[in-house]
Structure formats: structure tokens, C-alpha cells
């Protein structure tokens, strides 16, 4: 069994597709089909078998999942999280990050004063959005880019207040 800190979330079952038990898989890899090259597991570390059927216009994958063969079985998988082992991921280039490593990082201002933390990272198709939770518990959504976040380390990110927030 693997602890969740050794696992990286790389996909989620969005819904079922058709009557043969196929599922629509939203892959967090780039390109989306890269997920098929990994040894996939669930939260408990049990192996997952996925076979690609096709890819839809939104870039989502239509797949078979384990031994699921009916729509009723597939409907129960909505929201099912798919992971891979952190150790199986490739080394990152400079200025590349795994989303799992950004979640809950401290956010500092340009004077290195802590002002909040990353609460969540969202993506609705037009790029990553960082949900910030400030120390006063208010939240704000900002695009994840160098303009707003010029410095990113494994321990913190710096929010550029010069940019209109």
C-alpha cells in the first residue's frame, strides 16, 4: 500500500460514455494520452487497467476501465481518482512543477511576508488558476503565470502585488 504523499493525482473519471461501460477520463498529463504510459493505481495503491477507445473533441479520453462492462457499473465511477507513483514520474525541467507539489504552499509578498497559502489549483480548459486563501480567510482566483507568481520554490511562492489583484 502507498501513502497518498507518494502518489500523484493524474486523472479523474468524469462520467460514463455509452452502454458498454466506457468512461470519460480527464487526464492531467500533457498530452492527455501520456497517462496511458504510467502504472496507474487508486488511492489504496491497487493497480488500475485502462485501455484507450478514443479521444473526444475536448481532449478527454474515452476508455475501458478495469473489467467494467455496463453503463450502470461505469456510472458508479464518476469522480474516481487515478494516481501514479511519484517515483515513476520524469524529472522536471526548470520552472516546471507538479500540481500536487503546489497545493498548500505558503504565499509570500514581495517583502517575503507570509500572506496566505495555495488552497487549490483549478483548470477549466484555458490554463491553471490558483485559488489563494489569505490569512484573513478570504479567497481569490488568479491565473498561474509568471506575472502573478514570479518566484516558485518547493517551499513557497511569491505573489506579485505590483500586478493588479
From Swiss-Prot:
GO molecular function terms listed in the Swiss-Prot or TrEMBL record: ribosome binding
Highest rank taxon of the organism? Bacteria
Task: Report the principal subcellular site.
Answer: cytoplasm
Q: Where in the cell is it found?
A: Cytoplasm
Quote the function comment for this protein.
An accessory protein needed during the final step in the assembly of 30S ribosomal subunit, possibly for assembly of the head region. Essential for efficient processing of 16S rRNA. May be needed both before and after RbfA during the maturation of 16S rRNA. It has affinity for free ribosomal 30S subunits but not for 70S ribosomes.
Kindly state the subunit structure of this protein: Binds ribosomal protein uS19.
The Swiss-Prot or TrEMBL record describes its family as follows: Belongs to the RimM family.
What does UniProt say about this protein's domains?
The PRC barrel domain binds ribosomal protein uS19.
Record's protein name? Ribosome maturation factor RimM
